[in-house]
From Swiss-Prot:
One of its GO terms (cellular component) is proton-transporting ATP synthase complex. It comes from Paraburkholderia xenovorans (strain LB400). NCBIfam families: ATPsyn_F1gamma (TIGR01146), PRK05621.1-1 (NF004144). The lineage of its organism: Bacteria, Pseudomonadati, Pseudomonadota, Betaproteobacteria, Burkholderiales. Keywords: ATP synthesis, Cell inner membrane, Cell membrane, CF(1), Hydrogen ion transport, Ion transport, Membrane, Transport. One of its GO terms (molecular function) is ATP binding. This is ATP synthase gamma chain. It holds the Pfam family ATP-synt. SUPFAM superfamilies: ATP synthase (F1-ATPase), gamma subunit. Belongs to the ATPase gamma chain family. It is a peripheral membrane protein.
Amino acid sequence: MAGMKEIRGKIKSVQNTRKITKAMEMVAASKMRRAQERMRAARPYADKVRDIAAHMSRANPEYRHPFMVSNEGAKTAGIILVTTDKGLCGGMNTNVLRASLQKFKELEGQGKTIEATAIGTKGLGFLNRLRAKVVSNVVHLGDTPHLEKLIGAVKVQLDLYSEGKVSAVYLAYTRFVNTMKQEPVIEQLLPLSADQFERKEEDGTTPSTQWDYIYEPDAQAVVDELLVRYVEALVYQAVAENMASEQSARMVAMKAASDNAKTVINELQLVYNKSRQAAITKELSEIVGGAAAV
């Protein structure tokens, strides 16, 4: 009977755990939908800024913003690493950190040192364990990222590039593909290339940008401001995609945990039933044996 009592305790414990994981799955599903909406809402802004910047760059070919000038001679590279603040999201952080580590080794193989910006506590902890140079960080963004919280940390990397101190700035994050699939991505953020300004419509055509603007105070000042806003929008978009990926990965992980808990409960219930059956059979045998002796 002591064994049966222990099994009942295990069943109760797993049932309580399943209630928690089921609740977390439902919360993650709700947060995932909101994160996807924010991710989709951020895209039109970045697209419009890109269209205007492309138009102005073509209209003023003699001017090249520092973000579009190569700093190949610099011996340092910058990287903005976007991860989550919390765990329980499967292998999402592990995958992007593994890809980042490979990029670090690649850059170090080229004789470059790394100056990193961490967005998220998991990435910050990873960089600290590597003893990497962290020039800025932002953590505890919550479930709703705000651009103003990111600007300060991102600006450090933009200033390093503008001053020619880093050869390139890379952006590492987890791209949202669909609910069941998220993939680690490392993109070159700076220098900007002409290809980044060639946006394609869904039918594969290039959108028309034949506009006539009057610039105040002048086109150069507007381009300077626009390109900074464009790069900030790219980072915000990456953070929004990372958060959508986080909630999707957490929902899938909690569903797997709930399903596994159900399997464990069924197995324990089977063991309990067998133990109970054996105990009843033993008692009946003792009763029958006692009656026969009388």
